């Protein structure tokens, strides 16, 4: 099951931008846990976004 949590730091309409719009200007990190879960995180001044992908 995929889950996404978006915290918009400025305005709600800013959250409509896609992750591709932020990838080039933010810290884009991918980590994999020992249980197979993968975390994608984007963090910049406008948005903080975390996506967790769990292998089923």
What do these predicted ranges mean?
Residues 1-37:
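Structured alpha/beta or helical-core interaction and ligand-binding surfaces enriched in interleaved
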Residues 34-56:
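Short, compact, well-ordered microdomains
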